Amino acid sequence: KITPDSTLTPSGSENGMLAQRLEGQDFQDLAFGTSDAKTITVSWYAKTSATGAGNYTVKVEYHNGSANYAVNKLFAFTTTWTRYTYTIPATGTATSVGIVDSNALGFRVEYHLFAGPDDVHSQFTQWTSNSTPTYKVISGQKNFMDNTNNELYITGLQIEVGDTATSFEHISHGEQLRRCQRYCVVYGGTGTRHLGCASAYNSTNINLSMHLPVPMRAVPSPTTILTSGNWLQVYMGASGNISNAGISLTDIDADHNTLRAYITSAHSGLTAGQALWCHVLANAKLIVSAEI
């Protein structure tokens, strides 16, 4: 669900969208860049509030590592839950330009919410080189930002080989969680959360080995959400210290499954090698993200 918190009349190249970004290595079975390139069907469910109903540009895009190629189409979103399907033949650049084969951005589905006049263009009816400006909409696009009562709900996005949308594939909560944790792991909640045991690097900084629940897509970046200006509590014996410590992450193994967290200004008066234990404060968070 998304809703505007203020109104906006877009000008120039202002634009906004919801986008699902996907790894290129997961789309090699499409055989793009060859004469065997495959047709795909994208499907999803959507509905709007009464004021949010209108035509929305849906753009599907692939990347070859240096440029992107796209198709797009207008869809009328209404106040009733509806399943939409978008079948895209393997024409245009699909037979001549492949999808990057790595964990980098290779495929993206975009639901455009608004765009200024500079980003309004004619429809791409087949896979086409998508030159600047990248975020194009089709004439007739709804301005989702014209009313703070606008609401848009989207769920059940599915991408399949072929010209038919099959029933949405439901997977177990455990498997879905593992897939999500490839991109983001959150430590913290309403109560304190144990983060791990660490050793003092010097009098104020510490090294913490972090064992992630699954291998991540890439070396992640840390973000902290504070409570009363702090996020971390570090104990050396019974001596605890609460702080807004700095944190950086580096790989210990090539699978991005174990990390070294170097945490600065975590305590004081430490001796190198001293053992410590760390937890995230209640209502604070450490977010470890490897999003594309």
Where are the predicted features?
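Extracellular and organelle-lumenal recognition/adhesion modules and their flexible linkers in secreted
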Residues: 1-292
